[in-house]
Amino acid sequence: MSEKGETLIEDTAEIEFEQTVDKTQQWGRLKNAAAFSLFRDLHMNESLQRKHARSDYKVYDLNNRVIFHVINTTAMPITKDGPFCLKVMNKDKKSVAKFLRNEPKRSYKQTGLASLFGCCSDTEDTMEVLDDNGLIIATSFLHHDQFRGILITMKDPAGKVLIGIQASRDQKDVFAVSGPDNRYLGEIRQKIISSGNSTDNYKGVACWFSTEVSLNVKVFFMAAAFLIEIDYFSETKSRQAPFRTPEADYLNPIIKTPPHNERVPKMKTNISKTRKKKGKVSDASKDSRPSETKKETLMMPEIHHTKHFDSIGGEEQAFAKKEKVEEFKPTEAVKEEVDVNGMSRDQFRNAAKKVVDYLMKQDESIRAARCSPALKPGYLKALLPPKAPQKAEDIDDILEDYHKLIVPGLSHSSHPNFHSFYPAGNSFHCLLADLLGGHIGDAGFYWTSNPALTELEVLMMDWLGEMMALPKEFLLFPEASRGGGCMQRSDTESNFLVLVAARTDMIRRMKQRDKRLRSSDILARLVAYTSSDARRSIKMKMAAEVAMVKMRVLPTDQNFILRGDTLHAAIMADIERGLIPFFVGANFGTSGPCSFDHLHELGPVCREHGTWLHVDAAYAGTALICPEIRGLMRGIDWADSFCTTPSKLIIAVCDVCCLWVRDRHKLQHASLENHPDLPFKGLPTSQRVGALKIWFMIRSFGVENLQNQIREHIRLGQVMTKILQKDLRFEVCNKVVMGLICFRAKSNDMFNKALLYRCNETGNVSLASCVLQNKFVIRMCINSPKCSEEDLDSAYKLICNEYDILKPFQYRIEVMNQAELETFIRDPAKIHSSAEVSRRFPVVNPLEPCRSLAQISSQMHTAEYADPPGKSNKSPQVAAKGELPSAAPPSSRTPNSDISEKSDR
């Protein structure tokens, strides 16, 4: 080494090990040494290695002390051709920098003689270095030419060269580092490190730099070393090669193996104990004897993963004791019949076939079934035994009881005329995915518990985000993105999670302005806002009560849309009262009237006052897959978070709500767990396999088929809207954009409640209700994939029939209270007799002058408490002229019966 190089401080890669080694004799007198320890599980398919599939790095000093932790925050294993994001943290758990490669950027060019041999002549790769605030401070460009060697250039955002690293084609172990003025700064080398045993050695990457080097340059050294290790020293074939002698394998670039005390025991075959016959030796004994002709050498075992940390800087878990593992031969078939959880494999196969056959028959006959059950609450208690069985029962008996006891009490959401709620489509592909997910039986606590499903969730969120054309700030993998998506169990949980995240962020910002403020004082002044959509406002109020903040419900316009001037006036009024606005919940096709708030008006108001804008698109969010619907998302760039439930619009059986945030770090701060393995999730630690079902759904149908299904859903909604608008007896109460129609009969709330009950009582249709601007309306959601125009026509005819049956009783029903209405509808036929109905609810004579409701109520009250006919000298009250004495009660009439009491429309 030159004189200039002798003055450098050598930094070597050291790993923790029990046996102390005299490093001074090996490497000379070193001070302030730092090194990189790269751990990687190369045998994740081996059963012994499955629980150690995480790839983390550490930076050590000469005294074997950890000075930096480098965490793989992408929840993906590091590969040469894959994206990664490495987060550098010091020993105090504070972020120092990030190394980000969003996706491999390689160009393979075959020119000249290289094309004849089929080799790559030019390879390029790029990695960004970010500070703890997410700002790019440098970008490294690796250029590998097969004939000229490796060159790494690190530049700042302005394009100025910070450091340059170069190695010739034949120089595989040393990379010279120079500054912007070509001044020699140090070297990056691949070094051999002894583990304390003369036969056990491993390799690592070491950085040498002078004492004058600043912290930023050290970070650049670190970034370049990781890029070299991943792109150059980490060839798979070289990694798996045996490491026998350090001298012969010095230039063979392989990943550093762990020290001796962390190595995986070599798999050995247990010697079967057999009695030896005279003159014969068992085959097992022959195989177990070492070969006398071959010299026994210590082979490099399978590379083991680093010791797992529950948290950075925490105590390391002790490794399990080394045990001899019997070699498994996959070619041998298991012949014995093994009971798995009380059922053999053949029994499960037969039972699964019966269940599938039953589901297919049920799906074929779904139109003949009732949409909703005709049962009273508590019916199942009388049918099931009071105590659990002591002994196991046959699966056939269980399936039979399911058909007889459970199915009659089910609401068939896949029925073509089930329009009450949002039916989850029973796609066969998603049912298969649900079966696979149930067999996995893994809740997915964090990456190490279930790597595949954790990574699949992150990827599916980006798939859906790109399909819906969400802003790139909401996606995880674009360059320098701080956003991302995660899956929650419901939209209510998503709303609560972002509410807590906004609360935490506002408290942090207020404390930065004035450190004297206490969290409790700030919390008492926080106020959130949402619109007066009844169902959603109730959910948001509950979330606000749990989060211990105030929730203010704002009025909407005639189209149930929250406007920007309304929000601005409310915020200014609360600021004058000393409150702190921090959260605004906007509607984007939610569950009530399917209204779309003007985000382009709400966004600037929220940005002006520093409030969190959350967009709840529980129902209509997935419709953004269709390009023609995206005009409704004007102003989505102002949003801080966005959530939707795919199962409410598409045919996926997805029991998840997809939540995207602009800054995932704020969501992590609000989470109960802040483990590096965890994606930025919310309250639940465990997670179902919703990502697996979404993956099956997207691949099975494709984006085009999903778009066609949404368009058909919207078309049927418009068809039903036109039918209702042509009928003068009904009025449509919302602006129908999707397939959700809110309508009511042109009468008061009591009559519409009776009409809704009568329609649902038939079992041929299922409708729901909601309250819009203090009016009771009937809510019809067309969402079943089996629904057609013929089904809508039959549902409309049924509604008209029930309306005609109730029309003669309209004036009586309108003056009833809730208790009287329930009695009128639900009580036996005795209450519904013509004389009893006429006595309790007298009809209005249309020939008499119009009376007020008070007069009608007074007359009804007098008739209610009059003496019975047998005890009074007066005859019973005779109905006024126009009374229909032969009118039968609604419960005793059928749609096909002759209606003799129809009134003129």
Swiss-Prot record:
Assigned EC number: 4.1.1.28
CC cofactor: pyridoxal 5'-phosphate
Any Gene Ontology biological process: dopamine biosynthetic process
Positions where N6-(pyridoxal phosphate)lysine occurs in the chain: K648
Region listing for Disordered, in residue ranges: 250-296, 861-905
Skewed-composition ranges (Basic and acidic residues): 280-296
Pathway: Catecholamine biosynthesis; dopamine biosynthesis; dopamine from L-tyrosine: step 2/2
Enzyme class, broadest EC rank: lyase
Catalytic activity: L-dopa + H(+) = dopamine + CO2; 5-hydroxy-L-tryptophan + H(+) = serotonin + CO2
Keywords: Catecholamine biosynthesis, Decarboxylase, Lyase, Pyridoxal phosphate
Bias-annotated ranges (Polar residues): 889-898
Gene Ontology cellular-component terms listed: cytoplasm
Protein residues bound to pyridoxal 5'-phosphate: T492, S591
Pfam family, one: Pyridoxal_deC
Family recorded in the similarity comment: Belongs to the group II decarboxylase family.
Quaternary state and interactors: Homodimer.
Record's protein name: Probable aromatic-L-amino-acid decarboxylase
